[in-house]
Amino acid sequence: MSAEPRINDRIRVPEVRLVGPSGEQVGIVPLAKALELAQEYDLDLVEVAANARPPVCKLMDYGKFKYESAMKAREARKNQAHTVIKEMKLRPKIDPHDYDTKKGHVVRFLKQGDKVKITIMFRGREQSRPELGYRLLQRLAEDVADLGFVESNPKQDGRNMIMVLGPHKKKTEAMAEARQAQEARKADAKANPGKSQNAAETDDAEAEAPAEAPAEA
């Protein structure tokens, strides 16, 4: 409901189709009867479908409903604001060492709760071998399957082939786990100062370091 619905005495119709507190259908009743039931249940009569004939009204705690709706909307905006799409570029004939390096970056991004756009760049005669890019994307998706899933299947995009991986964990969960791990390392460093004097400072530097720009293989 985008606009404020009419509630209780603001409802001005002779009869309504009433829905009970648990979602049960009460049926069409006079408005006076619906208001009487609302008082008996110590709830509000809320018009949830004004354009229906007769209008549909439900018995509910409107204050609680508004609060829960606001919290859900706030959480949705929070998760949306944290959504980041990283990008990793690979060549179809990438060597094993470079592949492992790029895969490591993808793993890190997924652990952080970020989506990753994988771009396979074809050059020259490589463009006649799209299956090379497809197999490479399949291999990468399988290698990181425990951390992410294929959100957008491999597809051609001009001379490139792209695929999007999504994280299994929400961004907020990943950030919370990262903070907990960092605090645990700091506590360990304090308990064992001889082990690593600068452990806590190193963690802070790593946490604040910006993600590196995507590099070509």
Curated annotation (Swiss-Prot):
Region (Disordered): 170-217
Skewed-composition ranges (Basic and acidic residues): 172-189
GO cellular component: cytosol
Subcellular location: Cytoplasm
Keyword line: Cytoplasm, Initiation factor, Protein biosynthesis
Main location per the UniProt record: cytoplasm
SUPFAM superfamilies, sorted: Translation initiation factor IF3, C-terminal domain (SSF55200), Translation initiation factor IF3, N-terminal domain (SSF54364)
Gene Ontology molecular function: ribosome binding; translation initiation factor activity
GO biological processes: ribosome disassembly
Transmembrane regions: none
PANTHER family the UniProt entry points to: TRANSLATION INITIATION FACTOR IF-3, TRANSLATION INITIATION FACTOR IF-3, MITOCHONDRIAL
Functional summary from the UniProt entry: IF-3 binds to the 30S ribosomal subunit and shifts the equilibrium between 70S ribosomes and their 50S and 30S subunits in favor of the free subunits, thus enhancing the availability of 30S subunits on which protein synthesis initiation begins.
Record text on subunit structure and interactions: Monomer.
Family note: Belongs to the IF-3 family.
Protein name: Translation initiation factor IF-3
Source species taxonomy: Bacteria, Bacillati, Actinomycetota, Actinomycetes, Kitasatosporales
Chain's gene name: infC
